[in-house]
A protein has these predicted regions:
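Single conserved hydrophobic/aromatic residue that forms the stacking wall/gate
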Residues: 1-11
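Non-heme iron-sulfur electron-transfer modules
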Residues: 28-48, 52, 79, 90-101, ...
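Short Fe-S-cluster ligation motifs
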Residues: 46-74, 100-125
Length: 130
């Protein structure tokens, strides 16, 4: 699967655990987040699949990407695509989540670098712009 993604220039979604535990591979399928490492292409045939590359509009970053950048919601960047995609899905379903709701929603996305404080702050910032 990695070679196919690289050929299609969709290389920012990550495979971390390959067992659907870390969340680095999250993409949107028909607008809902899905851990792609354990999903078969046949399962999403005919669906709209969006990777982090698909969030930008006319070369401009999505508000969630801007917030992660502005508020340092990333360090090494490995988990960032999945974290951003999950956070966007959250805000599509809940426009003003509490800190607890954000943390609960993102519990399937593991980050070993940030301690999550800046990630939660970034999600709250993006909520004001989405």
């Amino acid at each position: 699967p990695v070679n196919r993604r690289q050929r299609q220039m969709c290389i920012r979604d990550s495979i971390g655990c390959d067992t659907s535990q870390c969340g680095a591979c999250v993409v949107h399928v028909d607008g809902n987040s899905l851990k792609s490492c354990t999903a078969l292409a046949a399962d999403v045939n005919g669906s709209k699949v969006t990777t982090i590359e698909g969030l930008e509009t006319n070369g401009k970053m999505h508000p969630m990407q801007e917030a992660f950048k502005k508020l340092h919601g990333l360090q090494c960047g490995f988990c960032t695509p999945g974290m951003v995609m999950s956070a966007v899905d959250l805000l599509q379903k809940n426009k003003k989540p509490s800190d607890t709701e954000i943390r609960d929603w993102l519990e399937g996305n593991i980050c070993r670098c940030t301690g999550y404080q800046n990630i939660v702050a970034a999600v709250k910032e993006a909520a004001t712009k989405m």
